Amino acid sequence: MQTSSEPAASETAALLGKPLADRVMRGVRADLKAWAQLDPPFEPQLVSVLASDDEASQVYVQSKAKRAKKLGVAFRVVDLGAAATQEALEQTLRELSADPAVHGIVLELPLAAGLDADAALLHIAARKDIEGLSPANLALIAAGREPEALLPPTPRSVRFLLRHALGDDLRGLRVAVIGPGRTVGRPLLFMLNNKGATVTLCNEHTRDLAAVLAAQDAVVVAVGKAGLLRPEQVQPEHVVIDAGINVQESGDMVGDALPELPVRAQTPVPGGVGPLTSALMYQNLVRGVKLQRGEPVDD
């Protein structure tokens, strides 16, 4: 079951992703070690597909490569460049999906201008879609059938952290999600609803945001706009989960919320959502591989 391995809840003012990621990775390493000891040894392969010059995507790819090397997962990048055509992108995804040597595929978003991500995601095999963004996986989530899906790692990371801060039972809690994007906001809306939370969906243009947020127990921000969430918009009892990533000219990475907001708890950027997201992606890889190999998979 996708949620059975989620860490137990505990209140904390410093919502760091690494301690939770370490718990997830212990299980991932155990499976990878067992495969490495087979005769012949089995090593899963993860492929990251780029079709843009987006700086944040480059950061994510570098992070994935480092983690894969440490784990013993084969990793390669297919960089089609910002000038890639829709046809070339879709053909690449079809070929990777059909390749038995490839076990996980990540399409790095956003794509270059003119490319259709929704159309491209249709060409990733559901069991290789370790980012959980294909229509097949998202439809299962929206239908409340999470155990059958590969859940998107970033929104799942957000939900982990909310449960860690507010308790395992999210029923009745009020959560504002700022940013209705494909990778975080949209799937998170359904994933929180599946756990009984009451979700208010906002965007960067929401009027009188402070008034909208006042009644919430938690605020999730995932727009991709540095400094979007400010002190005057939050309440002392809020838990703030910052899923934004913005690379400044200096090369520093910052979130969508200003740091050290006057709230009950907040995730830092970097160090909050990111480490846990990476761990959950590899957990999805392991689960997807088991489905592909016909091995038993926990519901």
Curated annotation (Swiss-Prot):
Annotated function:
Catalyzes the oxidation of 5,10-methylenetetrahydrofolate to 5,10-methenyltetrahydrofolate and then the hydrolysis of 5,10-methenyltetrahydrofolate to 10-formyltetrahydrofolate.
Q: Which residues bind NADP(+)?
A: G179, P180, G181, I245
Keywords from the named record: Amino-acid biosynthesis, Histidine biosynthesis, Hydrolase, Methionine biosynthesis, Multifunctional enzyme, NADP, One-carbon metabolism, Oxidoreductase, Purine biosynthesis
Q: What is catalyzed by this enzyme?
A: (6R)-5,10-methylene-5,6,7,8-tetrahydrofolate + NADP(+) = (6R)-5,10-methenyltetrahydrofolate + NADPH; (6R)-5,10-methenyltetrahydrofolate + H2O = (6R)-10-formyltetrahydrofolate + H(+)
Q: What is this protein called?
A: Bifunctional protein FolD
What GO cellular component term, any one, is given?
cytosol
Q: How is this protein organized at the quaternary level?
A: Homodimer.
Q: What is the lineage of its organism?
A: Bacteria, Thermotogati, Deinococcota, Deinococci, Deinococcales
